Amino acid sequence: MFVSTPASFSTLAHELAPVRADLARRLAGPQRHRLLQGYPQVALMRSSDPEHARRVHVPLDTNRELILGVLPHPFCNPQLSGCGFCTFPHQRYASPDARSTVEAVIAEVRARTEAEAGLAQRKVSALYFGGGTANLTPPNAFAALGATLADAFDLRGAELSLEGAPIYFLTRQGAILDAFQGIPARHRRLSMGVQTFDPTWLARMGRTHFGDRGVVAQVVREAHARGMTVSCDLMINLPGQSLEDQRRDLEIALELGFDQVCVYHLVLFRGLGTAWSKDPEMLAKLPDNGTAFANWRRARAFLLERGFVQATLTNFERAELHATDRRFRYEELSFTPATTDGVGFGPAGISVTRDGWQPSDPLLRRAIKRVSHTDATAYREAIAAHGAADQRDFVYTQRDMQLLHVTRSLPRLIIDRAGYRADVGSELSDDFAPQLAALAEADLVRLDPDAVRLTERGMFYADSVAGLLAHERVTRLRSRRRLPNGANDAGPVHMG
């Protein structure tokens, strides 16, 4: 459907032409899920160190909501590197390395809550244990980490999430669940990386030892018996995967009683660097974007027709759960940077925070993004030496704040105009006029008086939407080779 644009969006044809061409190029390419980490991507961030991080650190505003992302370690143990498809950094699991890394995370929590103003004893709205395979953490080490976090923060009103592979929720008589349940919280939830129930595909992923349908069913029963909610990640558009197989995965997830189902379109293309991206047969069987979009629409319709609510781009929740405070809050809050700070601990931990000084003029507000070392050894060494492990940082300019707001809002399917104005002090239609016009013409967004809303097509191509909005600024950041102190440098990056 063609969506006409209001007069306020009228621009000269020569201004729109390059934007339209850029959008067409993006729509023809692979559609990644780069919205999870948020703007900017790591490659656009300046190389940092703990001493530099202390200089650019800003005190937190204790009136804002706070979420914590805690990565106990970066280790995993699939039989195939990255399960064939995963682009996130993982290292081969070894128990001694995992234990020593968790000890370093504990040290980081203690050091940073002591050193960073506005952090210690803060009320936490949601905490997410992620990383390599978080539930692969030795249970006693996980319990010690949980106790440290409970001492450093007020978790009594928090949602806690624990991510992992199905089988490790059950090993040692559910010891990791016992440790998880020992952390004070308002609500607890498990996030399982199921990917598929198909035994053939699990073998191709090197995930047969992570548990079959029976194991997954047992985890769901155990979690519900403990008062926890449970979500699963499922992938669609696997090479050569039939519609029947995609639908069957969704049917099984509902039969098993999952409270939330997260549906992910496979990211795979030549040159990606994953094991599957080097397999010509896999690449040859990939659906084109049009087919992949049609498959995603069917998956979305299947869940909506069965009483699920689409909470974000990828997360579908049972309607009766979504209407309560037991809905998935961490993701929801992570997509509202105007009101929420996110602080990360552990290898590859990400923090995006704003300062506690809140002038009436939004143009004077400051924000910074920091990313820790991803390698476990480098992370442990940095913590031992400095009590912090910053590898990259990025100080937001006003234009960057605008991009942070719009790109983080996209996963929530809507950019509220009044919220944007209150956050950055300008009008959405003025700041992104040609981009919004091109996106509306392509039926990717609907331009309503109160908000910009993703269409169903825009949901699937949300990565292209974000890239188009960020393109001009990202191009400028890419072009810089030597920057003055206080600026941001970066090498090539795809987002934008």
PLM feature segments, named:
Residues 1-70, 119-122, 442, 480, ...:
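Flexible, acidic/Gly-rich N-terminal and inter-domain linker regions that tether
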Residues 451-455:
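Minor-groove-contacting beta-hairpin "wing" of winged helix-turn-helix DNA-binding domains
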Residues 459-496:
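Short, amphipathic alpha-helical interaction segments positioned at domain boundaries
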Residues 95-114, 126, 135-426:
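C-terminal scaffold of the Radical SAM
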Residues 440-450:
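A short, conserved structural fragment
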Residues 426-438:
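Short amphipathic alpha-helical interaction segments
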Residues 62-104, 203-204, 208:
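Canonical Radical SAM [4Fe-4S] cluster-binding loop centered on the CxxxCxxC motif
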Residues 129:
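Conserved phosphate-interacting/catalytic interface
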